Amino acid sequence: MPRWPSDYQTGCIRERFIRENICLIDSVIKFSKANNVPGLLLFLDFEKAFDTLEWPLNRKTFQYFGFSQSLLNWLKVFYCNSENCILNNGWASNFFELNWGVRQGCPLSPYLFILSVEVLTNAIRHKKEICGVIVKDKEIKLSQYANDMTLILDGSEESFLESLKIIDYFGKISSLRLNSKKTEALWIGASADWDFKLCPEMAKKKQSER
């Protein structure tokens, strides 16, 4: 399925590999340092990503990408109005309905998730107020491997704040929320000219290094 996810996404797609993400981020860091270009990397972590994704977003995303109605009907059969139970030491709980999330271990789950997150990817890519790091005339804004996303920003306050706005809005329509304890930021290249208010621990570290 290489037609739909952007080139930034390498998870679960044939002929795309996680090493591409590592090489991309490493190249951006080295370029920023060598050319004294400011930049900010945001390593995003979504809370229980596969378990909380909203099904309505799945359906609308598949419609947007032009999947057939027949496939949409099958997805509805597999995921909508289904009942589940919990097995524990041979004991089965009562059945209950699930109205969100994609099943762990289901072969469809990675693709359902990737295509839904593509909504966030496109929003960031096309938002003019969000600027990435320009390497050899090519602007790089993000790197993705399934639910692991790294934003590659130019270090400006505007890019950072606009990114948070889009992520917050996406969270409202998808039920995906950032895990602030696991989301991390890393300055690269030249120092930024604004205070990083989100992470006070980072600000303290920056002050102690001066």
What are these regions (language model features)?
Residues M1-R210:
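Nucleotidyl polymerases of mobile genetic elements and RNA viruses
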